[in-house]
Amino acid sequence: MSGGAVGAHDGTLTMLCGGDVRAFEQCRDPLEAVSSTITHLGPLGAGMVGELACNLILGVGRLAIGEAFAMARRAGLDTDTLYETLTTCTADSRQLRALESALLRDEYPVRIFHGIKDLSAAVDSGRAVGQAMPVMSLTRELYQLIDARAGGLSGSDEVIRFLFDT
């Protein structure tokens, strides 16, 4: 599933499911209580691969957004103006918008962070099916480095603080 605690509370989680189609359909009603999107992706295990794909995109994206704004700050750009501009072009994303408070106001909400575990699972799963995972491997290494230097990450937005401070 994707959407975190807020999505669960609001009933807007995205469920990425795998397994027998009949069993999936039998579970649909209870899943609809907490989900706005429920997708059957294939056989048993397919939901986990879908979740790992989501986490891969989020992990890499968070670092890219953080680096972009760290560079902009150091170059003296008005990051409010940059943010407003990026949300009107092809760089716009839900993730960029979700990071607004960290990027513009140095607010880093404490959230459950499973990033390193999830990134490791994505690398391992890719390798298990014969897929090279160079970007994900580097991303995992960066998160591990940030985690070690920061004395632990209390939330996924903490990587932004680290990038701003280095």
Please give the residue ranges for each predicted region.
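Rossmann-fold dinucleotide-binding core
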Residues: M1-G59
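Helical "substrate-binding/catalytic lid" subdomain
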Residues: A46-L163
